[in-house]
From Swiss-Prot:
One of its GO terms (biological process) is hydrogen sulfide biosynthetic process. It holds the Pfam family PUA_2. Transmembrane segments: none annotated. This is Sulfate adenylyltransferase. It catalyses: sulfate + ATP + H(+) = adenosine 5'-phosphosulfate + diphosphate. HAMAP family: Sulf_adenylyltr. Keywords: ATP-binding, Nucleotide-binding, Nucleotidyltransferase, Transferase. Its EC number is 2.7.7.4. It comes from the Bacteria. Belongs to the sulfate adenylyltransferase family. Pathway: Sulfur metabolism; hydrogen sulfide biosynthesis; sulfite from sulfate: step 1/3. SUPFAM superfamilies: Nucleotidylyl transferase (SSF52374), PUA domain-like (SSF88697).
Amino acid sequence: MIKPVGSDELRPRFVYDPEQHHRLSSEAESLPSVIVSSQAAGNAVMLGAGYFSPLDGFMNLADALSSAQSMTLTDGRFFPVPLLCLLESADAIAGATRIALRDPNVEGNPVLAVMDVTAVEQVSDAQMALMTEQVYGTSDPKHPGVETFNSQGRTAISGPIQVLNFSYFQTDFPDTFRTAVEIRHEIQERGWQKIVAFQTRNPMHRAHEELCKMAMEAVEADGVVIHMLLGQLKPGDIPAPVRDAAIRTMAELYFPPNTVMVTGYGFDMLYAGPREAVLHAYFRQNMGATHFIIGRDHAGVGDYYGPFDAQTIFDDAVPTDVLAIEIFRADNTAYSKKLGRVVMMRDAPDHTPDDFIQLSGTRVREMLGQGEAPPPEFSRPEVAQILMDYYRSLPQS
């Protein structure tokens, strides 16, 4: 089985030992505490689940700046984005060396993790700008990732953490949320050797379904792990429970038995385009995937990134020896009226745009909101029905 990034064994930060978990939970209630941002909570979940292995906690400022500039920490370890825990104020934990991190997304703000504080540092505006430029390719405050990053405060607390729970992800999505540890175990149970991972933050239509099948066929994979983001997105995106239902329906009806796993992970989307694509590859290797699909404008938003920047970054900026996972580079896929099947558009040079069935996201939302199913060549009818029911449930503007 493919090894985790940077180590022979996965190093999740969740406290699995029941006695230790009980002791730590009791201790945490009496520790100085802070409510962290939603993004930091998601990162704590990812650390706990083993996705960010071998990192053991939140970065100090020097490591965060180094990661932003070179995708390596000051000790040379590879990690493609800064992992900061930013606060508006650290007054509540002043002088403390051990603190509790509380969850902003669960009622009552329960303790999510315990941190051994190694540094409390102020981040300057210039340092924030440097990180946003390097990671997001822009400092534009309208970029949703930049806006979120800049809204979290300027005090960075760092240090290793011990994670006590997986926030709302495990309770709200018990059939879908999986840790990297659990996915590795299931891959071994199934006897899969070659595994394709597919990232999605949206429902999957015919083009996505066929892309997974194309990738599996091309690399002779035993199965595909459809790995959906369960955390916060930008306003207007389809909520996770609806995406979950639509994707599960598609997988159950249209993939051969024992060739697909539908899973999810707890993380707030960065919309960091190429840098986020590298992070996605990083933690897909940690969960046991040997191949990862990266398509056009992967993890992008608006017009901030070129259509294939998320692919070329692996040639231009990622050292060849840090990731063992292989990238399956995809173009847009669409149904060809000429050929009667879904194809990658780059593989049909004799086609004109009119030869494909393509619908914009806006047009699809309009159709679904009006109770009109997209063509079956675009969307499976069972998937379309789930989405139509969701759009009809929304307040009419």
